[in-house]
Amino acid sequence: MMKSVSTRLCHSVSPARIGALMRFGFTQRQAQFLVHVLVFSGVFLERQYRMFTGLAHGQKTQDFLAKLVTAGYATPITPGALHRGRLYHVQYKPLYEAIGEPNNRHRKAASLGRFVERLMLLDAVLVDRRYGWLGTEQDKRTYFREALEKDLPDDWYPHLTFGTGEQKTTRFFPDKLPIGVPLKDDWRHVFLYLATREVPTDFRVFLLRHSDLLTSVDEWTVRVLLPRRFRKAAALYRYAVRDAFLMPLTPRDTEELDWYFRARRGEVVCPAQDPDLDLATAARRFSAARFEAAYRMWQERDVQALWALQSPTLRDHLQRGQGRVEFAELPHQYLQLTPLVGVPGGVEKGLMEGDNLPTA
């Protein structure tokens, strides 16, 4: 169950952060836009600034862009052989320090493909003002700790752990994808996912990584953002949802899967309880794409990663309408750089031509 929280926790673009950037000489509207950029993308297009402010391609817009560049706040990038169009990377560290994000990765250089992905996420946030949007790890953690009536263990939040011993570091919400939280009397939360490949291998891991948290959220939507080149992949993404949430494993399945994963990793294991189950048989039984995603999660969290696969809670959420999966096609071309998003994918195990892929 969830409870209402203060509005100040529902927005990463907070009045305090806007005020901090206004001290650099920006107007309130300019500062508000820049906080969106710093938190959600690190890069932006002139089109996005004009859409947010309602300004035309005129002197006010050009003055704002010129100020960013001449002051060293942002670097203009003119990609492509013809250098048509321009994106702006806001990399000035004092701006990030001013909003309490001195180590945010958005200020660092990245590939053009990654920049385009971030532009897409920024668009998705800017066009939907029905929700408050959270972009930083700390903002998400603070919100859910306050909003959930029952405290969740840290392991229930999406996370990745690196290193061992004193060098062990845990990053929460490592996908760095915006989360929309309800305002006023609504209870629905929106978890964005940007499709960067035709084959939804990473999406399967995303679903498993968020499954514990989703079971604790009263109403939720996973919104898959589809660049034009991937719009035909929606069926595969629906199939991935069905695998993750509509087909819970039995306790015996989980036990055998854990046994197989340990043997696959090279551990010395006792014979399986099923005398007919050997490594070759298990490899065939658990060859589908859903189990490859489960193996990736198991490598991170051991058998605990498999427990969520037994729960019928998310299946029940989807069947009752508490949970939804929706697809939003991104309409823009992004300086003709959309082909740089992701890489060509292969064929997932377990899918055959002509498979009926129901909508979740």
Please give the residue ranges for each predicted region:
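Glycine-centered secondary-structure boundary/capping sites
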Residues: 23-25, 72, 99-103, 125, ...
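Hydrophobic, Leu/Ile/Phe/Ala-enriched alpha-helical segments that form helix-helix packing faces
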Residues: 37, 53, 65-69, 124-132, ...
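Exposed, interaction-prone assembly regions rather than primary DNA-binding/catalytic cores
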Residues: 109-203
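Generic structural hydrophobic/aromatic packing signal, biased to beta-strands
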Residues: 33, 68, 88, 124, ...
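C-terminal regulatory/effector modules of DNA-binding transcriptional regulators
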Residues: 181-360
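Non-membrane alpha-helical secondary structure
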Residues: 10-13, 57-60, 109, 113-116, ...
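Short, amphipathic alpha-helical interaction segments positioned at domain boundaries
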Residues: 90-118
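Basic, Lys/Arg-rich alpha-helical nucleic-acid-recognition elements, primarily the DNA-binding modules
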Residues: 1-95
